[in-house]
Amino acid sequence: ALSGFAQQQPMYGQYMFNMLNVNPAYAGNRDVGNVNLLIRRQWLGIDGAPATGSVSYDQRIKDKNFSFGGQMYYDNVFIQKRSGVQGFYSYSAGMGNSTLSLGMSFGVMNYNANYGRTNAFQAGDPALQKVVNAFLPTAGFGALWSGEKWYLGLSSPNLFKSYKSEVNGKSVSMAGKEGHYYITGGYIFSLSDQVVAKPSIMVKSVSGAPVQYDLNMNVWFGERIGVGASYRTGDAIVGIAELQLNPQLRIGYAFEQKIKVVNTTSHELLMRYEFGGLLGKKILSPRYY
């Protein structure tokens, strides 16, 4: 059998903008209904470079400790295309001045790989000219412990290491996704009445790869403008800019440069719209995570 490429969880320069992408316990954390849009293009100028996009919605159920959400996404890398839908559910409980949330996600992913686009394998094998198409279940779990000025999260957005070996009914290829595990944390420092600093960290572990750290620092001015930078160990540096246009709408942009490879920049655009004011629910402002 031919072993295909194990799928990796997409990378996000602005994961702290919407942690629902890495932790299902984040569903409902903002208390109001909100839509998040992400578009990411990596390594511009390289054929088959990664392209990622998603749109998600989550909200807390009124006067309850339950929250729900959903997401549609795609993630394309060279010959591989991945798209799917997910549902999120979380439960929150007060713990003094803090809140503990536990969340789950369930979904289905379509994996498609066109081996006819690559010549990296043995020529002349008709199986390698086929298109692999598989539908795979996905499930995730997460915990989020947070206070007014801090948060700490532990999650695995993909618990299944699920494989399907099928090309026209023949067991010649595998489509899978390795389990990822994340630890996230952040704290908010008030530097003045108008300036707030938010350092944060994400630790990522995946089978077969070294542990990776994302070290981030964002600074907000007057609750309207945010700028920041990130360093992903052994991989990239990231510049971040965010703008709170009004109580409902925030946009963010990230520019990423690989450390070891020149001319491999990435661009990431995010947008969040909150429906609190329209639904009679107060939007939490300021809210930095």
Question: PLM ranges: what are they?
Answer:
Residues 1-5:
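C-terminal segment of classical bacterial N-terminal signal peptides
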Residues 7-289:
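Subset of outer-membrane beta-barrel
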